[in-house]
Amino acid sequence: MSSGGLLLLLGLLTLWAELTPVSSRDRPKFCYLPAEPGECNAYMPSFYYDSASNKCKKFIYGGCRGNANNFKTRDECHHTCVASGKGIQPRIGSN
């Protein structure tokens, strides 16, 4: 196979990996943890995955402790934890 063909194949595989949705069995276990604001008093708008609604929701993180179900953007939460059996998940905004 030519180097151009290999490059095309690599590009297609990369695109496929980016667009493939997370299935519930592939979802990291920390996605099932509840929102945990932590013990400190900072005001850091963050997002957590709510497994009951299969959506990322906003919460206020206090800045320390907490758990791994804590994302700076909705987009990061969505691509890590949201699952759908209906095909490709579109990218969403960060707010």
UniProtKB/Swiss-Prot annotation:
Subcellular location as annotated: Secreted
GO cellular component: extracellular space
Tissue: Expressed by the venom gland.
SMART domains xrefs: KU
Site (Reactive bond): 41-42
Physiological role: Serine protease inhibitor.
Protein name as annotated: Kunitz-type serine protease inhibitor ki-VN
